[in-house]
């Protein structure tokens, strides 16, 4: 299993009942991906297929784990999904992006590279943590700064170019 291509989507919790049901602790923004027939991966590369899923309680039964003894072996394991399958099964709206598409993008303002997106936080609106470009750090700017993901500060996101074009990002950096 290629770790770079995989996304953590759920933590498997405790078993429920005698027939192998297990609680899923969702770690994704797309709970609709959990349904009968969906396949996921464990860290060791094993593929788990959902035989039944209760979306109200977030409880699943996996193929070949249909009893409590087998299902108990899955407790505290992490479910993964590939980025490719995620793109196919989890639909986004206009001007929406997956986190994995945004992380690592370079941030530019007026053709000057400000840095790269290191993390994304949800604080009311989304906020990008930017790791400042080395050239700017050498000039005395902070190593990180935060850029709100709003139309006021983000002019354009181009996944194809690997860039985010900002407005007023440099002012935020100067005042950080």
From Swiss-Prot:
Quote the Pfam families the UniProt record gives. Answer: PRC (PF05239), RimM (PF01782)
Q: Where in the cell is it found?
A: Cytoplasm
What's an example GO BP annotation here? Answer: ribosomal small subunit biogenesis
Cite the PRC barrel domain residue spans from the record: 94-176
Membrane-spanning parts:
none
- Cellular component annotations (GO), alphabetically ordered: cytoplasm; ribosome
The UniProt entry, under Gene3D superfamilies, shows:
PRC-barrel domain (2.30.30.240), RimM (2.40.30.60)
Q: Which UniProt keywords apply?
A: Chaperone, Cytoplasm, Ribosome biogenesis, rRNA processing
**Which terms in the Gene Ontology molecular function aspect does this entry carry?**
ribosome binding
Return the InterPro entries for the record: PRC-brl_dom, PRC_barrel-like_sf, RimM, RimM_N, RimM_N_sf, Transl_B-barrel_sf
HAMAP family referenced in this protein's UniProt entry, alphabetically? Ribosome_mat_RimM (MF_00014)
Oligomer status and interactors: Binds ribosomal protein uS19.
Q: What is this protein called?
A: Ribosome maturation factor RimM
Q: Which organism is it from?
A: Campylobacter hominis (strain ATCC BAA-381 / DSM 21671 / CCUG 45161 / LMG 19568 / NCTC 13146 / CH001A)
């Amino acid at each position: 299993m290629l770790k770079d291509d995989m996304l953590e989507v759920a933590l498997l919790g405790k078993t429920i009942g005698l027939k192998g049901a297990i609680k899923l602790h969702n770690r994704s923004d797309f709970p609709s991906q959990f349904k009968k027939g969906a396949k996921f991966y464990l860290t060791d590369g094993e593929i788990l297929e959902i035989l039944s899923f209760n979306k109200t309680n977030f409880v699943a039964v996996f193929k070949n784990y249909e009893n409590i003894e087998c299902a108990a072996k899955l407790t505290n394991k992490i479910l993964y999904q590939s980025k490719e399958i995620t793109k196919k099964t989890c639909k986004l709206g206009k001007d929406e992006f997956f986190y994995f598409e945004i992380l690592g993008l370079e941030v530019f303002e007026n053709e000057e590279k400000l840095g790269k997106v290191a993390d994304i936080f949800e604080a009311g609106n989304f906020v990008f943590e930017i790791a400042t470009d080395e050239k700017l750090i050498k000039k005395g700017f902070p190593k990180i700064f935060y850029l709100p993901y709003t139309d006021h500060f983000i002019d354009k996101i181009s996944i194809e170019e690997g860039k985010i074009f900002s407005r007023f990002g440099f002012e935020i950096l100067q005042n950080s």
